[in-house]
Amino acid sequence: FIPEHGDFVAKSEKLLRAYLWSAFFTNRYENSAASRAFADYNVLKEKKKKKDFSDDNWDIVPIFNRDEYPLSNTDSLAEAGWPKSVGIEERGVLAVASYFGAYDFADNRQATFESIQHREYHHLFPDALLKEIEVKSLYAMNCSLITWKTNRVIGRKDPIEYLKERVEL
């Protein structure tokens, strides 16, 4: 429901981008996701019918009410679990990490909608290595999406050693 021409396009895209990131980084959809998303959709749809809508009244859309649904803070993001789980915030962290293309470490291929279906979750700092020093590894900040082939080549290698190998090639 984005128009094709005019300033309204930019305003609509800005609103929808803010909505998407808010969906990832607030707890609005942790419970009753379908009914809350539908409620937000209805308000967004009504708001966009008025071509002169402004940023000033975004908080009429429930997800933008920062008193009720504040954005995640840095501590919360640092503690976000493994993105393969069901959590919205975890997947949001991975979405941010992938925002600029999610290039594979080895073949430098950019993730696309098609290729990402075949990528694997990879620990930047290997699970086994972190377990040896009794550090939890299943955090979104320790995750990337890479090809299966790259994942097998990297294996349990120390990240510094792997990066040195990549640079020497």
Describe the role of every protein-language-model region:
Residues 13-14, 18, 91-94, 141-144:
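Non-catalytic, well-ordered alpha-helical scaffold segments
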Residues 111-142, 158-159:
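Histidine-centered nuclease catalytic patch
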Residues 1-2:
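Polyanionic (Asp/Glu-rich) segments that form extended negatively charged tracts
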Residues 23-26, 127, 150-153, 157:
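Hydrophobic alpha-helical segments
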